[in-house]
């Protein structure tokens, strides 16, 4: 028996929507990263984009456990000498783009490389309750009911 390799035409991508209101960021990001990679499917192939499309709504209403909301620090560098910039999840969630907290968490849970960048493109995060993907008829995932620790 030969090893099965998925072909491009055999990929079945589904659409899922997750309401992030009251959910813990790290647990949500780990779950979403698994769905984006397609590791929950029996036909998972590492070199193919066989993951699903994920829509996350209410991204500004996520929670952190412990003191991470005020004490966790996100770093980025401008590329110039002395250009190290710091921010906290509190500043990001109260800022102009609160959905970046979830995007940063999921992106850092994916591997590096061109395939991860392609998979990350299948993630759509919205800060409010509305999204523009009703035409795809996404299935709702109740992530909070999967484990009591998922919701705070």
From Swiss-Prot:
Stored InterPro entries: Ribosomal_uL13, Ribosomal_uL13_bac-type, Ribosomal_uL13_sf
HAMAP family linked: Ribosomal_uL13 (MF_01366)
GO biological process, one term: translation
Region (Disordered): 128-152
Subunit comment: Part of the 50S ribosomal subunit.
CDD domains: Ribosomal_L13
Pfam family for this entry, one: Ribosomal_L13
GO molecular function terms listed in the Swiss-Prot or TrEMBL record: mRNA binding; structural constituent of ribosome
Family: Belongs to the universal ribosomal protein uL13 family.
Top-rank lineage group of the source organism: Bacteria
Gene Ontology cellular component annotations, sorted alphabetically: cytosolic large ribosomal subunit
Alphabetical keyword list: Ribonucleoprotein, Ribosomal protein
Physiological role: This protein is one of the early assembly proteins of the 50S ribosomal subunit, although it is not seen to bind rRNA by itself. It is important during the early stages of 50S assembly.
Protein name: Large ribosomal subunit protein uL13
SUPFAM superfamilies: Ribosomal protein L13 (SSF52161)
